[in-house]
Amino acid sequence: GNSFTLISPTSNEGSWETPYELDKNNPSVIYAGYDELYKSIDGGNSWNIITNSITNGGNIDEIALSKSNSDIIYISDNSNIYRTSDGGLNWIQINNNLPSKYITYIIVHPADENKVWVTFSGYTAGEKVYRTIDGGQNWINISGALPNIPINCIEHDNTSNLETVYIGTDLGVYISDSTTNIWNQFNNNSLPNVIINELEIQYQSNRLFAATFGRGLWSIDLEITSPPIANFSYSDSV
């Protein structure tokens, strides 16, 4: 941290939050989303474009890599989502029955690259969270009775046999699993009803961390088996 080197692949402007993703299977491989998806295999010293103008000039907003197969990548631009299964040589659009809303987040199951969750912004009731088990050929609406607020992020609990997922909304954190479309608020009056921008699970401590818009960083023990009983603690620094 004493010095930094600029490794941006292009002088073009990206999205407000330009996505970068590190391949967990090879830390020298980095992906960056601008008007194209850029890939580096040498830690950012050089970059190659692995999309062919599939976004028609739009910026790539989200990148999700499969941990089980590095050739499988999902990206989105605004309301469109794309998949490659050969490392970027060929891409297919997999919107199918998804709503034409802004995609805020994509996550891929760590052991099954065909299981994917996407979340949406906006204020259209019942169009918040979708899941696929076949790589995007078909999408299942799992929004249930979520309140009509934007969903900003989603995190999968890799320790859960029920494929538990947490979502960050404009009014805190909610939890559900693959067996139901029932969402429970995971705040319990400890975490303020505030915008959640990012969720991350720290498995060494078995805790979920929630980054808020203007209210700091909060953490909580992961849900085990009982209904959510949340007891957030506050950290003043990220």
Model region roles, listed by residue range:
Residues G1-P227:
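Extracellular glycan-interacting surfaces
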Residues E223-V238:
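Proline- and Ser/Thr-rich low-complexity, intrinsically disordered segments
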